[in-house]
Amino acid sequence: MIYVSGALSMWGDRMWHFAISVFLIELYGRNLLLTAIFGLVVAGSVLLLGALIGDWVDRNPRNKVAHASLLVQNISVTVCSIVLMLVFLYKQWIESIWDGWLTVVCYTVVIVLADVANLASTALTIAIQRDWIVVITGYNRGHLAGMNATMRRIDQVTNILAPLAVGQVMTLASNVIGCGFILGWNLVSLIVEFIFLSRVYRIVPALSVKPPVPEDGQASLERPAERTEGLVERRGSQGQCPARAPGGCCYGDLTCKDGWRAYYRQDVFLAGMGLAFLYTTVLGFDCITTGYAYTQGISGSLLSLLMGVSAITGLMGTVMFTKLRKAYGLVNTGIISSCLHLCCLLLCVCSVFAPGSPMDLRLLMPFLDANANSTLVEPLLPDRSSIHWTNNTVLFENMPSGMEPDSYISIILLFLGVITARIGLWSFDLTVTQLLQENICESERGVVNGVQSSMNYLMDLLHFIMVISAPQPQHFGILVIISVLFITTGHTMYFLYARKAKRKPAGLWPSAKVQEQTRTQVN
């Protein structure tokens, strides 16, 4: 039931994130401005509120957190879909009211509701995938690894199929029908997920037992030197989590500070930071890389095929994770995954200097070449007037003649590296995810994972800033090299964590009996 609930939630999220981007483009005259604003608002809100969301997850019963997050998320998407339907149906009439300011109000409402839905989705992800499944597996590391891998496989499949499904509806019908489809899906999904999560909560009694968050004056601060990897030591006689700020007028500021401090003092801090650094990259199947591929003559159908292959390699990474963890242990699995990831990315570095690469350093220093300004350059993200949507695929119309690359070796090496690297990437991601689950005090899981989400969004913002600073295809090689440097830094942080972790005696998760005794002490 937890898998079905997770699949429905992920499917709805993937459909919505794809559709809202297309809707905003269509609403603003096929311009990327609204989409860019939406992206910044979403990233900024999670960055600022991640710790608060996590703290809210920690302080409230598990069933109330899951139900509230689910309701807020689906209701926000439903209302937003209704607003979008009205805007699409009566756009000309709305634009004529208040000299067009009603249109601005509608755009603002859409972006705010979509952002609220994303925040609720973040809370639900932290609650279910970072806390619930740990308890459901009975604190069994093998079962936890299998459950994490299965959830990630579901995520990989929905990442491909969900946008394709809603894209077909929008293409064959209309944007209004697409909004209606998403609206209906969310209402049905809300009911099913609510029932399934409630049933899981009743079936697993341990979910109803949750240690309270220590307040100032109720728990002594735990010194970093006294922290160990095992949950037994952490929850033993001196295993209470550090105190957190109580509610009050300065609750938000104190919670954010306490959340970041809690994140910093975790034993797995370097591993979490290493994972966050992997978000600063253009080496993925996002709008940046696909835009670059189009400028290099890659057709939309071929790109869709490559995305499908990348999903398969991602699934291979989840399978490899479970086998490596069983054979070599969790920490060593991260080391092997890191090495595999970096080795595959060397192909991307080679693509920068291979035949067919458009990299031209003179564009960064035009004063060295008087003719640099006369060089024809294309932005990584083309104007939407030159493209159209067809079955979730963007196809170029009327590509300038003579702009085809001399050789496709560079682009082949690039995508070969990106696709194969996903095996190590997803195995590493699962490794760090489980390390966070195993090594974070139960009453701090929410706030620490909330800060981790904030870090991920922060590093993701940096890669967009990189593209804004160097937006031409001729700059893409520089972005590739910078991305590999960030990824290398992230894996280096993990290597430092692994070295430190291996010097400590391995901690054991408590048995059900010890777990119950510990919770009795906390309560």
PLM regions and their residue ranges:
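Short amphipathic helix-loop junctions that connect adjacent transmembrane helices
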Residues: F18-L33, V134-V135, G284-L303
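Transmembrane alpha-helix termini and helix-breaking/packing motifs in multi-pass membrane transporters
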Residues: S21-Y28, S81, M85-I94, I160-N186, ...
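Substrate-agnostic recognition of the 12-TM MFS/MFS-like secondary transporter fold
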Residues: M1-I20, F38-S76, L102-T171, I182-S198, ...
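Juxtamembrane intracellular "pre-TM" segments in multi-pass secondary transporters
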Residues: M1, R199-G274, T295, V394-M403, ...
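Membrane-helix interface/capping residues of multi-pass secondary transporters
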Residues: L32, R62-N63, S174-N175, G300, ...
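Primarily residues marking transmembrane-helix entry/exit sites
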Residues: I2-Y3, L32, T103-I111, G248-C256, ...
